[in-house]
């Protein structure tokens, strides 16, 4: 079953590896062409149900869902897409199933199955956690949070035009296994995702069996709906482990700009730690993309901050905000978050020598318009109430390779960000 021991070992070592600074990691270069074809193993058992649902969704959505300009056309397109997707054929996916009636999945077994599907691909990239602890050890286990724009399948194969990425590297049946492998490798307690267009037929059914409770909020006018053979709208998804947290309240937020409702969304949930009883708010968002929309993003960010101000009762509840902000640190929306009365700090600044500089990139791709290397993804946190105990280091340029992302090694054009948080002693009275 373990066709790539190197791939297996790199995955299993990630979760409980000690927080050492930048252990040596192999610089794996992306192949210029797909590996030679070899006979593929039989379809893995745990992935079979999701594969069947995904296939049903593709076979039923064979036309472009034209969005048009009218409200009636919008809702018609949404209804058509959802009715032809796996969600309508599997209504149990529309709500989180009762975990008592759900057969759990062994994470190691699912990891083995993903590895079997990926046996012709090069091993996954090695990344290491950087120890950022400056205080005494916490009495409670840290809260591991993963932020990741996983790249909507419809956009990856359609609109995004990754000219240096072979079509074979974007095949969903293999790319979804790369995504799952990344999640299984780092085992986050909380998972914040953007560009999710396979929630109902892949992530919700599989992650719920791994013990996660999930929430999905699609974009009202998802660009995925304009792509032929789409799997429905993309949106934000938030998952948390039910054995660690209890959901206190949840809000789906459609962001506004200049009082107008926009196409961008956010999810904000207040969770209670079952072990300590402490509460905190976790939010995920994905702001408007493209150059020229800086003021629009700024307005969306201000709206999100106002919503979070209300949800956290004026910063009384500790807050973590994950997102693809589509904004460099020089943009106004970044400055709004950095100077907010919510007292937020960006976790990945702590990896820099001075603790004040963002990474040089969180996304690196080549499109028809040219090469793009930007820092767009962030994990913000309440610096008065939370400590960052460790953060997952980013891939090096050598690891990413000359053809950039996505690739046979890595499933998205954005890198995942992973941080371990603990409560400060001063935050005892805040939750």
Curated annotation (Swiss-Prot):
UniProt binding sites for substrate: 195, 219-221, 263, 286-289, 324-326, 414
Cofactor(s), by name: Mg(2+)
Cofactor: how and how many bound: Binds 2 magnesium ions, but the ions are only loosely bound to the protein.
Tissue/organ expression: Adipose tissue. Expression is higher in subcutaneous adipose tissue as compared to visceral adipose tissue.
InterPro entries (alphabetical): CCR4/nocturin_mRNA_transcr (IPR050410), Deadenylase_nocturnin (IPR034965), Endo/exonu/phosph_ase_sf (IPR036691), Endo/exonuclease/phosphatase (IPR005135)
Superkingdom in the source lineage: Eukaryota
Catalytic activity: NADP(+) + H2O = phosphate + NAD(+); NADPH + H2O = phosphate + NADH
Region described as Interaction with PPARG: 343-353
Outcome following mutation: residue 160 to A: Lack of catalytic activity
A GO CC annotation given for this chain: nucleus
Impact upon substituting residue 324 to A: No effect on activity as transcriptional repressor
Pro residues compositional bias, start-end: 32-41
UniProt keyword Zinc present: no
One Gene Ontology biological process: mRNA stabilization
Quaternary context: Interacts with PPARG.
Family of this protein: Belongs to the CCR4/nocturin family.
Identification of the protein by name: Nocturnin
Lineage: Eukaryota, Metazoa, Chordata, Craniata, Vertebrata
């Amino acid at each position: 079953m373990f066709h790539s021991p190197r791939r297996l070992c790199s995955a299993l070592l990630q979760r409980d590896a000690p927080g050492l600074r930048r252990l040596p990691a192999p610089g794996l270069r992306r192949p210029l062409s797909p590996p030679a074809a070899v006979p593929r193993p039989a379809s893995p058992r745990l992935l079979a149900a999701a594969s069947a649902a995904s296939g049903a969704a593709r076979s039923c959505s064979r036309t472009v869902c034209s969005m048009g300009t009218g409200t009636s056309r919008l809702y018609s397109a949404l209804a058509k897409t959802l009715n032809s997707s796996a969600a309508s054929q599997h209504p149990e996916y529309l709500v989180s199933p009762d975990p008592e009636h759900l057969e759990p999945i062994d994470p190691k077994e699912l990891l083995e199955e993903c590895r079997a599907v990926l046996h012709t691909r090069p091993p996954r990239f090695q990344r290491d956690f950087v120890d950022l602890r400056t205080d005494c050890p916490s009495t409670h286990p840290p809260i591991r949070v993963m932020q990741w724009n996983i790249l909507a399948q419809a956009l990856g194969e359609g609109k995004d035009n990754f000219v240096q990425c072979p079509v074979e590297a974007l095949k969903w049946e293999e790319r979804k296994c790369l995504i799952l492998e990344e999640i299984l490798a780092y085992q986050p307690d909380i998972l914040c995702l953007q560009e999710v267009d396979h929630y109902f037929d892949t992530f919700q059914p599989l992650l719920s069996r791994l013990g996660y409770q999930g929430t999905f909020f699609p974009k009202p006018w998802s660009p995925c709906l304009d792509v032929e053979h789409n799997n429905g709208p993309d949106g934000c998804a938030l998952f948390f482990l039910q054995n660690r947290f209890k959901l206190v309240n949840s809000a789906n937020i459609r962001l506004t700009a200049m009082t107008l409702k926009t196409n961008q969304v956010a999810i904000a949930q207040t969770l209670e730690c079952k072990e300590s009883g402490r509460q905190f708010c976790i939010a995920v968002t994905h702001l408007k993309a493209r150059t020229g929309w800086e003021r629009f993003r700024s307005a969306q960010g201000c709206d999100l901050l106002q919503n979070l101000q209300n949800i956290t009762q004026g910063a009384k509840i500790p807050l973590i905000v994950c997102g693809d902000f589509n904004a460099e640190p020089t943009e106004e929306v970044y400055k709004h978050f950095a100077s907010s009365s919510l007292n937020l700090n960006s976790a990945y600044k702590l990896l820099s020598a001075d603790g004040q500089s963002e990474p040089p990139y969180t996304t690196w791709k080549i499109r028809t318009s040219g090469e793009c290397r930007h820092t767009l993804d962030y994990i913000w946190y309440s610096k008065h109430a939370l400590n960052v105990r460790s953060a997952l280091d980013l891939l090096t340029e050598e690891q990413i390779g000359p053809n950039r992302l996505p690739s046979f090694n890595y499933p998205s054009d954005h890198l995942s960000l992973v941080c371990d948080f603990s409560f400060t002693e001063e935050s005892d009275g805040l939750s």
